[in-house]
């Protein structure tokens, strides 16, 4: 028993260590720009610095430590976190939640795309700006160096991070130790800053500055950016590992660093442009700049990987068009590369760097997307607490209280809309338009399909009565997502009168759970003699490889005929959309054009399901929108 307990502790510690290189990268590099962004609006004096530090301290405690690590962590979907996991959890309990859940989910995914564009830009730019602390003459190199780093960062996505990923955790541990020590060295010179732990100073700050103090919350919020990643990465490391990493390493280091910056600016009012790099002795500054740059690259890698992961899940759930998914690791199933998304993120990130030119300017655009994502998380977890956990209404009242705090931060972020905050909102809006148009287009395809498929029921009767001649062999038909039970392919068979002696229709069902156990994966329905419908159930985080899945299926599902894999022929459907001027419900003409463009360029079934090219036949189906 002692050995087992010791082994478990070692595993937890190793997971906590690994989490440092992924989970805490974003929030761990916030000290580069967050504190400097806040203090530029106020005169440097004891009351202002103590008030700002008190707001930072209690924000990290209430929102990140209590809300996320204590409350939100309870809302895991079979160990998985993130907005899609939360939405899936609600759908398991509320079978028909209505359009509001779809709306929130699509907005949340759009915000994650915006975050994936903004985070690499502000993080790496803020690190490279350390060159100015070395010499003002180096300022002209900040932009080109940042762009070069970003170019190689996005270029390396196609080969994955498997080989260098093992170094992420050690680097981030060194980073946290370094910023913690540098902050501590300043605190011991001015220990009075520790009085800011008292919430009185945060309250007094509001009493002095009144409504203007609300504006400063937009800057204070920057210390929490990356906090949402703690929940999003839950499936990779687990609750205990992330909690241990946060409370043992990340949180103490961050607080020491922020309080150290506060102590420093009170003693050196003239060094307020880059208070973070001012903590470093001159002899250590070049090392600090290199370490900060590497840390921000790791933080950026984490958010890019998270964007790939969430959009892969959205693609499986048919919330967005099917994307080309490349698996970059044979061992880590979660490591994926999405070429189109990588190009969009790279283009957006580099454009923002060129347009805004400094991390201070970019900070105005940053934060709003994360703030909205946190608000959405609070709402969804509140619903889960009431409907899934059966919390009493009195206990659920904690969520409105958290919402009030987060809405106060959002109010502080609103003025940023005029100076760049509109960018993540625009990105999220464009993402929402694309996803909602895809949803509406598919709903229309389902409607048109069911209208035409009503007559196909008699084919089943004819097959049962042996009124239709059959040819020898077997065909395996892959059903498209808009088609529930393969009526569209049956319609094709009825037209050309080609019926195999044995036919298997395979329908892929993506469930509201991250993983489906193998014993629940397959469902067999006999439709007619020699004609079977098989449902294969996947979780929204699983990788789809249909030929491999079929091997397992044939072992577990009894069929009254022999399956010869080498002679198996796959049939897939390719949908073509012809636009008409007829006004469709919930779809304007521009949406028809957009949907037609997306369905033409979506990854075909043969790639998505990884079917063999030399044994796959495509059948075209036409619809008029």
Swiss-Prot record:
GO terms for MF: potassium ion transmembrane transporter activity; symporter activity
Cellular-component GO terms for this entry: plasma membrane
Keyword Nucleotidyltransferase among record annotations: no
Pfam (any one): K_trans
Record-stated family: Belongs to the HAK/KUP transporter (TC 2.A.72) family.
Entries under PANTHER family matching the protein: K+ POTASSIUM TRANSPORTER, OSMOTIC STRESS POTASSIUM TRANSPORTER
Known function: Transport of potassium into the cell. Likely operates as a K(+):H(+) symporter.
Protein name: Probable potassium transport system protein Kup 2
UniProt source species: Legionella pneumophila subsp. pneumophila (strain Philadelphia 1 / ATCC 33152 / DSM 7513)
């Amino acid at each position: 028993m002692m050995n087992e307990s010791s082994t478990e502790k070692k595993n937890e510690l190793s997971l906590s260590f690994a989490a440092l290189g992924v989970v805490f990268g974003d929030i761990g590099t916030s000290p580069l720009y967050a504190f400097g962004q806040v203090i530029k609006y106020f005169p440097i004096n004891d009351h202002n610095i103590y008030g700002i530090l008190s707001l930072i301290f209690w924000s990290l405690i209430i929102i990140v430590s209590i809300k996320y690590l204590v409350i939100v962590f309870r809302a895991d979907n079979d160990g998985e976190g993130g907005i899609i996991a939360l939405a899936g959890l609600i759908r398991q309990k509320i079978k028909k939640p209505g359009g509001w859940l779809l709306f929130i989910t699509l907005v949340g995914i759009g915000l994650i795309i915006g975050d994936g564009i903004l985070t690499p830009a502000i993080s790496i730019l803020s690190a490279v700006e350390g060159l100015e602390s070395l010499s003002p003459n180096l300022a002209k190199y900040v932009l080109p160096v940042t762009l070069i780093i970003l170019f190689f960062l996005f270029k390396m996505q196609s080969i994955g991070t498997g080989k260098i990923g093992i170094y992420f955790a050690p680097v981030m541990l060194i980073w946290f130790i370094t910023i913690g020590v540098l902050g501590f060295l300043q605190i011991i010179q001015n220990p009075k800053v520790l009085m800011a732990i008292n919430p009185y100073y945060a309250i007094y700050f509001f009493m002095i500055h009144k409504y203007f103090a609300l504006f400063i919350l937009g800057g204070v919020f920057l210390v929490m950016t990356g906090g949402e990643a703690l929940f999003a990465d839950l499936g990779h490391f687990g609750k205990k590992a992330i909690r241990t990493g946060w409370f043992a390493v990340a949180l103490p280091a961050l607080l020491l660093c922020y309080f150290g910056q506060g102590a420093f600016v009170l003693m050196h009012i003239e060094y307020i442009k880059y208070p973070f790099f001012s903590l470093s002795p001159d002899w250590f500054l070049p090392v600090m700049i290199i370490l900060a740059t590497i840390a921000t690259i790791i933080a950026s890698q984490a958010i890019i990987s998270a964007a790939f992961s969430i959009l892969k899940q959205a693609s499986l759930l048919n919330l967005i068009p099917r994307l080309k998914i490349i698996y970059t690791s044979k061992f880590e199933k979660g490591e994926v590369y999405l070429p189109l998304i990588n190009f969009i993120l790279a283009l957006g990130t580099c454009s923002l760097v060129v347009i805004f030119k400094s991390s201070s300017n970019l900070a105005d655009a940053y934060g709003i997307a994360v703030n909205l994502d946190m608000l959405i998380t609070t709402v969804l977890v509140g619903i889960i607490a009431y409907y899934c956990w059966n919390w009493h209404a009195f206990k659920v009242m904690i969520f409105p209280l958290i919402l009030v705090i987060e809405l106060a931060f959002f109010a502080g972020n609103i003025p940023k809309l005029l100076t760049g905050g509109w960018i993540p909102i625009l990105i999220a809006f464009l993402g929402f338009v694309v996803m909602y148009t895809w949803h509406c287009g598919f709903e229309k395809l389902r409607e048109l399909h069911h209208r035409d498929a009503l007559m196909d029921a008699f084919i089943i009767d004819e097959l049962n009565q042996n009124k239709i001649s059959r040819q020898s062999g077997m065909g395996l038909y892959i059903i498209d997502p808009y088609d529930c039970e393969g009526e569209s392919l049956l319609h094709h068979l009825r037209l050309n009168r080609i019926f195999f002696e044995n036919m298997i229709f395979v329908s892929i069902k993506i469930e509201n759970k991250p993983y489906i156990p193998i014993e629940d994966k397959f469902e067999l329905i006999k439709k007619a003699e020699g004609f079977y419908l098989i449902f294969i159930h996947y979780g929204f985080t699983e990788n789809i490889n249909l030929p491999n899945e079929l091997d397992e299926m044939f072992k577990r599902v009894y069929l009254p005929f022999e399956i010869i894999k080498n002679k198996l022929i796959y049939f897939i459907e390719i949908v073509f959309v012809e636009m008409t001027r007829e006004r469709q419900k919930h779809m304007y003409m521009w949406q028809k054009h957009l949907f037609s463009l997306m369905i033409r360029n979506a990854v075909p079934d043969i790639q998505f399901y990884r079917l063999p090219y030399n044994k796959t036949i495509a059948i075209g189906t036409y619809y008029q929108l």
